[in-house]
């Protein structure tokens, strides 16, 4: 058993299942029937969804929510989030955006804050709408643009390309009268954003994209925030721009409520005037923390719509491991097994990176990975099976060398809080 130095957010598997090929064909089409696309996505197995980042969703959502809900609920939300990203991305870009024309369509969102945004813009200092890669975030700027509010949307390079293709394909669409998109991974885009705000314009940003000129992994202009006990280093450049120009910031998210697309509007953070020095720094830090508090609280009831959750590990900080002495962990483990108990993975802490039988496990808090040898399939299965688990009888049936290796691995996991010890029909975390 060995540690894996790092994990990759997206899995590139050698063999792609037929269901994935079929879904990929549908997702590349503007003419596919929405009901068929949705049904095909729901029918994907967890192994199929591993090709679309399910492993990362599981790890990241478990790190955030594992102390707030049962592991089974988190795994369900991770699956929903992976499907939501595929479904809502296709539905917007291939079914909605590609069919717009000269007549603005009715708004897709309920409780769209048109009057609130107009009121902020009337102050003459511009305005920023801060949202997240969550739910119907794409509908917020397009609905506002169709309502006659000129809006600029900063995007990463790939997302920018999606909108630019749509604009070139249907330049006559009413959307483009008030909707402008810029790539903030290029200097011209960032400059255009600053000029737009300086002139009193409106900007909408999905701030958890956490990208800029240095890309999503760059270290420039970052603040450390706490989300449900997990720290993350997030971009603050747009908030600093708001402080510089005195632009108020209104947080808005759009999620599903009783089957409807509904906006939720949160209190405005208003610098009141252009700020400099310590005043600007204090405003930026307070506002960034407040915005990510909004995201964290929203995830408690809408994590299944967080399409950005598969990239959270790029900007969250690993938690330190409270590791007890190996001898203490070994004694506790031996005590439970000697009394006919069993040991299994604590799935709120350590989980397989894919479905049963996977040989790699990850500590969702520290992001430390463990790899089992290819011939340890039975061991991997037992670790994940609460009904069987690892027992003294199973260990005693192993050869001497293999038993020693397995035992040490179990003791290490126990010392790092990665095992649950079951005995006398009770459960205790080790």
Regions of interest found by a model, annotated:
Residues 178-190:
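Active-site glycine- and acidic-residue-rich loops that bind
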Residues 189-359, 365, 374, 411:
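Non-catalytic C-terminal accessory region of glycerolipid acyltransferases
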Residues 152-160:
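Short internal beta-strands
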Residues 2-131, 136-137, 141-142, 166-172, ...:
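Membrane-anchoring hydrophobic helices of lipid-metabolizing enzymes
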Residues 371-430:
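Long, charge-rich, low-complexity alpha-helical segments
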Residues 100-104, 173-181, 219-227:
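Short, basic, glycine/proline-bearing loop/turn elements
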Residues 142-149:
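Short, surface-exposed basic-aromatic patches at helix termini and helix-loop junctions that form
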Residues 1-55, 62-65, 301-314, 321-357, ...:
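N-terminal targeting/anchoring "stem" of glycan-biosynthesis enzymes
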């Amino acid at each position: 058993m060995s540690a894996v130095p790092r994990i990759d957010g997206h899995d590139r598997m050698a063999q792609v299942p037929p269901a994935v090929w079929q879904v990929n064909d549908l997702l590349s089409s503007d003419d596919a029937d929405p009901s068929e696309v949705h049904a095909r996505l729901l029918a994907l197995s967890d192994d199929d969804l591993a090709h679309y980042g399910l492993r990362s969703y599981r790890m990241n959502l478990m790190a955030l929510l594992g102390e707030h809900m049962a592991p089974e609920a988190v795994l369900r939300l991770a699956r929903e989030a992976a499907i939501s990203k595929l479904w809502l991305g296709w539905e917007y870009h291939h079914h909605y955006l590609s069919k717009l024309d000269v007549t603005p369509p009715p708004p897709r969102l309920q409780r769209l804050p048109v009057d609130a945004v107009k009121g902020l813009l009337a102050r003459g200092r511009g305005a920023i709408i801060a949202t997240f890669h969550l739910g119907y975030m794409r509908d917020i700027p397009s609905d506002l643009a169709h309502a006659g509010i000129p809006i600029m949307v900063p995007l990463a390079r790939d997302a920018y390309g999606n909108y630019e293709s749509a604009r070139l394909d249907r330049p006559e669409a009413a959307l483009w009268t008030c909707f402008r998109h810029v790539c903030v991974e290029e200097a011209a885009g960032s400059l255009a954003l600053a000029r737009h705000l300086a002139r009193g314009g409106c900007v909408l940003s999905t701030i958890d994209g956490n990208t800029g000129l240095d890309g999503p992994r760059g270290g420039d202009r970052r603040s450390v925030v706490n989300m449900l006990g997990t720290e993350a280093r997030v971009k603050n450049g747009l908030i600093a721009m708001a402080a510089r120009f005195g632009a108020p910031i209104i947080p808005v998210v759009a999620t599903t409520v009783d089957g409807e697309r509904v906006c939720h509007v949160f209190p405005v953070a208003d610098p009141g005037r252009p700020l400099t020095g310590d005043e600007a720094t204090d405003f930026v830090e307070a506002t960034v923390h407040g915005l990510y508090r909004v995201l964290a609280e929203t995830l408690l009831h809408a994590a299944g719509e967080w399409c950005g959750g598969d990239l959270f590990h790029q900007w969250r900080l690993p938690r330190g491991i409270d590791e007890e002495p190996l001898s203490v962990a070994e004694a506790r483990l031996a005590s439970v097994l000697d009394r006919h108990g069993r040991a299994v993975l604590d799935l709120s802490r350590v989980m397989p990176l894919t479905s049963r039988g996977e040989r790699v496990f990850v500590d969702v808090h520290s992001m430390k990975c463990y790899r089992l040898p290819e011939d340890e399939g039975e061991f991997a299965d037992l670790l994940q099976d609460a009904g069987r688990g690892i027992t003294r009888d199973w260990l005693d049936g192993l050869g001497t060398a293999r038993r020693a290796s397995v035992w040490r691995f179990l003791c290490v996991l126990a010392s790092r809080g990665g095992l649950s010890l079951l005995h006398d029909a009770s459960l205790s975390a080790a």
